[in-house]
Amino acid sequence: MSSENNAGANLVNQFNAAGELTHLLTLEGLPKEQILHILDTAQQFVSVTDPSREVKKVPLLRGKSVFNLFFENSTRTRTTFEIAAKRLSADVINLDISTSSTAKGESLLDTIDNLVAMQADIFVVRHSVSRAPIEIANHVPTHVHVVNAGDGSHQHPTQGLLDMYTMRHFKQNFKGLKVAIVGDIVHSRVAKSNIHALTTLGCEDIRVIGPESLLPSDLDMLGVKVYHSMEEGLKDVDVVMTLRIQKERMEAGQVPEGDAFFNQYGLTPTRLALAKSDAIVMHPGPMNRGVEIDSVVADGPQSVILNQVTFGIAVRMAVMSIVAGN
């Protein structure tokens, strides 16, 4: 994991010459002040998404064009980015990858060049290839902005930010917080983004729990505590985040059996009881009920999974607003 992240960090330039955030590509190395600025800005946008508000829009991106380029499937991320852009009054174009010229062999950067020629202002990019959004950001003109919506198993910065927002909302601060991330860590861009953000924000007790086959070999370099037992790893934690098994990133024969995984690592009410009584349960989605999480827990009073989705709109509004210069 570290080799991939370090390689990515060497290629990333998220700031312009004036020191302003112009792309959001990774949370690795993003300063604490910048993360807090995004979270604070998102907090201001929460009121825009309030159901009681008659007009759920602000004009910050009026006249701007946001292109959603999703080369991997998505429900929550793509939809909340679209909602966020529209609530900022942007024009939103969702490129249908299956019918675009990339399906005919056009290169990624040639596609980008053509969309820039159509006056694109912001690209929101999800791609199966790690660091593809970084390649795009290094290629586009300086007036065009790129937001990474998840690249391979590398990073998912806006998911990490909305997770930080959720934790801060329910737990107020990160100092003294105990966070457990459970499941398929080795393939998870969400886990990597969360670990980087939590470390930057001062969380000193980050735990990862899973079978050895689903944990990167170099986790100790990130300063996290590694557990192979739920009973040990969940003791007295404030936050439990479960992750799905990413079968699409595994070779044949590597995929754990769902029942066997659930029996050992599924988040059940009994296991959740090992955490603090006011612990919150998080999941970036999509959930596989009965594999990494019990429905009783997913739908229970400690679950903030749907809050994550709601907060994601405000966080993505904040990110697009900030990179566009607001």
Swiss-Prot record:
The keyword ATP-binding does not apply. GO terms for molecular function: amino acid binding; aspartate carbamoyltransferase activity. Keywords: Pyrimidine biosynthesis, Transferase. Carbamoyl phosphate binds at R76, T77, R126, H156, Q159, G285, P286. L-aspartate binds at K104, R189, R244. It comes from the Bacteria. It is an enzyme of class 2 (transferase). Pathway: Pyrimidine metabolism; UMP biosynthesis via de novo pathway; (S)-dihydroorotate from bicarbonate: step 2/3. PROSITE patterns: CARBAMOYLTRANSFERASE. InterPro entries: Asp/Orn_carbamoyltranf_P-bd, Asp/Orn_carbamoylTrfase, Asp/Orn_carbamoylTrfase_sf, Asp_carbamoyltransf, Asp_carbamoyltransf_Asp/Orn-bd. The keyword Methyltransferase does not apply. One of its GO terms (cellular component) is cytosol. It catalyses: carbamoyl phosphate + L-aspartate = N-carbamoyl-L-aspartate + phosphate + H(+). It holds the Pfam family OTCace. GO terms for biological process: 'de novo' pyrimidine nucleobase biosynthetic process; 'de novo' UMP biosynthetic process; amino acid metabolic process. Its EC number is 2.1.3.2. Disulfide bonds: none annotated. Belongs to the aspartate/ornithine carbamoyltransferase superfamily. ATCase family. Catalyzes the condensation of carbamoyl phosphate and aspartate to form carbamoyl aspartate and inorganic phosphate, the committed step in the de novo pyrimidine nucleotide biosynthesis pathway. Heterododecamer (2C3:3R2) of six catalytic PyrB chains organized as two trimers (C3), and six regulatory PyrI chains organized as three dimers (R2). This is Aspartate carbamoyltransferase catalytic subunit. It comes from Polynucleobacter asymbioticus (strain DSM 18221 / CIP 109841 / QLW-P1DMWA-1).
